[in-house]
Amino acid sequence: MNKLVLISGSSRGLGAAMAKSFSEAGYKVAINYFNSEKEAKDLSETLSNQSHAFKCDVSNKNEVDIMLENIKEVFGHHPSILINNAMTSYVFNGDDRKNADSISWDEIQNHLNVTLKGSLNLIQGLISDMKSESFGRIINIGTNLVQNPVVPY
């Protein structure tokens, strides 16, 4: 098993915390970001093991394929662990978040494109490499907002 983990949405928050933990455990870390370039590059510089930041919109299959090729170029092999953690910019403040009567389908579709389509794009981009190595781990991170919603009342 190679010790390379790809964490989508890992420039800040939970993703950055996981990147730090994997680095401390001796893993190389491929940090994926979309908007938070400074945070991603700062994180990459602070990790003790080899790491690198890769910009990619995971909802775009072409960008995912390019990122995976770039990861192989930088590290010499594909990741053996994939953590799907990317989410769209989300407002956790119930008072500032759109309500059901004002949110548009396009906004919902954007969330689905990043969380579901993005995960599928990454899985499909890595699954053949994982099969050929007879090893791979895929972890999908969700949200507990359906169980503990942030509501403005």
What is each model feature region?
Residues 4, 11-12:
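Conserved glycine-rich cofactor-binding loop
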